[in-house]
Amino acid sequence: MVNFSRKRPAVSSLFSQQQAIEQSLNWQALQPDLVIQDFPLEPVNFWALQPNATQGIDLFLRHPTRSLLMMKVGEPVEYAELLQNFISQNHHKVRSIFGVNYVIEQGDSFSFPHVYTEPAKSLDDNFASQGEALSALYCDQFQLFGSFRIHPRSQDIQLVPGLVHKANGGVLILSAATLLSQFDLWGRLKQILQTQTFDWYSAHPFKNLPCDIPSYALNLKVIVLGNRTELATLAELEENLYSFADYAEIESYISVAEVEEQKTWAGYVQQMAQEQNIELDFLALNKLYQLLVRESENRFLINASPLKLKEILQDASTFTEKTALSAVDFEGIFQQKLAQYGFLKEQTYADILNEQVYVETQGEIVGQINGLSVIEYPGTPVCFGEPSRISCIVQFGDGEVIDVERKNELAGNIHGKGMMIAQACLSNILDLPSQLPFSASLVFEQSYGEIDGDSASLAIFCVLVSALADLPLPQHIAITGSIDQFGLVHSVGGVNDKIEGFFTICQRRGLTGKQGVIIPMTTIQQLSLSDDVKSAVKNGEFFIYPVEDIYQACELLFGRDLLDENKDYTEKTESLSRLIQRRIEGRADSERKSFWHFFRS
């Protein structure tokens, strides 16, 4: 049988495995753990997680003149009922009657109808209210402002109260999306809030009301819920919005950096679990925390969404058909979801393993490095990590670095920025008196869709150095990280997915005990890796190397210093800058010889 597999290059002799192991992360650092000691804890409600929001709401409701609060939330449908209940429970007023009673004396063929008001005395009066909190995430002008109706035969008139009347004396909760989709509502609502008076208007711009209808005073406060984009759009349309409106936000992510914050969050989880008739032990709570850290990419911040937490608890309980959940149960539903959503990911990995997409995980190659990327497919709820081969070829030229993706409009602006930073960093580090006498072309091999982001700038820098110094890079090490012009390595997103993507390819090909990834030191707090990765690191089969700057990255990849440090170098340990300088000098000598040869001939 013919073997069509590519020949794998020999393993690098320059990469010091023992030196690298000493710089790799310990397996205990790969998953975060809660530090609370007491469990179970006293259950707390959602608003215990939102001290800033509760204080803002309280100040708004007690303020004598403020009538509009813009509140940033994740999804209005998720928080409207919570907010309505919070206001009803914590700002309950003595039951009193607000509003008026409209008395209508119907007209006849000889007279117009006559309408007048009298103070409301009971809730049976047509425009009476009790000052309650009401919410309506969708409404039209008739539902919001009420309506004026005329019977088609008798011509009798009827006044129908709207939400602004029913919430008189209390709070009305609306969505920014409704106001943006029907922006004509906003002008009238603003007038009502600023004047605290309700005036009747005809619904038809070319028809007048058949009779005068007296206005009446309102005592109304409105809270508008919306995400940041919706509130920003509304603020653009209403330039002076925050001259008369207040602002607060329900935090999408809450801090769990301190022990007391972890206790508060744990108490909230217990409250939610009790509402679903679910029991949790401490290990289950800790696993839930680890899964939420994967989503937030920060072990000190986790998602505060009640809907998200409720879904996770219900999914785990439904999947296991149990009400007493353990850590194994949460891991089980997590793995089931990965499999359920994982068709495209598995096809992508299969292409790499079948060498339809060429990614090397052993040996060493000049001018090639494995970068780490995150793939997102529209219409799917998850993303996943994938190694991508970045290659660089240099030739004599004028110093231009050609970004093939950018030239073919397959890369975004942030990618272009990262590419230019990598070039500037290299020139700054080498301290060249003039531009390089080389040109280079950089390619993300077998990449056919649009790419963006600067998380490959560290990989781009290293592959440029490899090509210029004519030194090979180890293919069993993948790398991610963004850099600045001074060579510092900065944080990137999706680090868990990136690590697990490269690990999966290495694991399915067979772990050699040398494979690993280089990540920014600052991303350690993002780590919440799978048990498989944790086990492989613990057994010395896979390594994760955090770096702070390009010097550490180059030392790991090449086994050499990037710059001369007044050491006694041998041919095998000569610094990278000296190798590049020697190549530049060789180019200059070649040009001089060509020049004299031209005149002698």
UniProtKB/Swiss-Prot annotation:
Keywords in alphabetical order: Hydrolase, Protease, Serine protease
Domain of life, per lineage: Bacteria
Lon proteolytic domain boundaries: 363-560
Positions of the catalytic residues: 455, 498
Enzyme Commission number, as recorded: 3.4.21.-
Biological process terms in GO annotation: protein catabolic process; proteolysis
Alphabetical list of Pfam families matching this protein: AAA_32, Lon_C
Keyword Signal: no
MF GO annotations: ATP binding; ATP-dependent peptidase activity; serine-type endopeptidase activity
Family: Belongs to the peptidase S16 family.
Domain notes per entry: Lacks the ATP-binding domain.
Protein name: Putative Lon protease homolog
Organism: Haemophilus influenzae (strain ATCC 51907 / DSM 11121 / KW20 / Rd)
